[in-house]
Amino acid sequence: MKKVLSIAGSDCSGGAGIQADLKTFSAHGVFGMSVIVSVVAENTSRVIDIQDITPDMIEKQIDAVFEDIEVDAVKIGMLSTPECMKAVAKKLLQYKPQNVVIDPVMYAKNGCPLMNPTAVSTLIDTVIPLADVLTPNIPKAEKIADMQISTVSDMEAAARKIYAMGCKAIVVKGGHHIGNAVDVLSLIHISEPTRLAL
């Protein structure tokens, strides 16, 4: 059975965050583990409060998982502060897991902010380069790329701009696009030719 670690916030209503990830993993026959970085008191209509976990405790949770379990993939969601991002990045660099998927969370579905606005530069400098796949939707891609997205060409330009920040692949999800939902994938293909002995 594959084992996937979710690093994200806890949603007490069960509709997002760690709880949603663990349900999804289970539904697909994957063993899910979790590192909680923030406890979010929220429901379907509002975010009541957010309590961030200390960077030290975040690091200890990551250590607890990696020292005992072989992790096949890591899925990262909400990282609310620069300190949280740095703690997670430090441990990912230490353990070097394969298959790191980052879906940066900036806002709750109801629009309430879940990421400190000052944390975007830390996300770009510290977290994005660790992503095997980065999966922002249009509003997140606009924030990261610092540009407005209103067309598929804009999505492509944002994907190229974000890709240059160091992730291995990016999928800009177009569910927030007016009209048809279009996703834009940007990645690098490395070809290693076979040497022939003469």
Descriptions of predicted regions:
Residues 2-6, 26-109:
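Conserved N-terminal subdomain of the carbohydrate kinase-like
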Residues 46-53, 112-117, 145-150:
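Short glycine-enriched, charge-decorated loop/helix-capping segments at active-site entrances
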Residues 7-10, 105-110, 141-147:
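Short, basic, glycine/proline-bearing loop/turn elements
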Residues 7-26, 195:
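Glycine/serine-rich anion-binding loops at beta->alpha junctions
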Residues 188-198:
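Single conserved hydrophobic/aromatic residue that forms the stacking wall/gate
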Residues 22-23, 85-95, 120-129:
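Short amphipathic alpha-helices and their capping/turn segments at secondary-structure boundaries
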